[in-house]
Amino acid sequence: LTAFAEACGVTAERARAYDPQPGCQAYPAYVSWLALNASPPDVILALTANFSAWGGYCARIAEALRTHYTFPDEACAFFDFFAQPAPDLDARATAAVDEALKEDRLDVVAAHRYGRLLQAYEATFWNSLKAIP
């Protein structure tokens, strides 16, 4: 993200002095909580849906940075990377969920709750960025 920060005019000194926005920490904290506490098949289902939305956001951000701010490709590389679907992620996720279904290890209610909360925490992330003066 160094090239992106530089394109935004963020100096090394300013980056060191940055105080994280609490609302921007909720999503990664929740993903960590899921990794420690939730059943893998439930998390796979929730994250697969969330990553699809995230990839769309990244594609739109990269396009906007280039179109409206003339950011170079290097500055958009992070967003370009996540805008592209992982080559076999959906197939691997489907196989894992299918196996969990066959073994009655998928809690659909929990998976939906995790997905809903991931989306809510992601919205909190974006709203926190929007609120920065």
Q: Residue ranges of each PLM-predicted region?
A:
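Acidic, carboxylate-rich catalytic segments that either coordinate divalent cations
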Residues: R105-P133
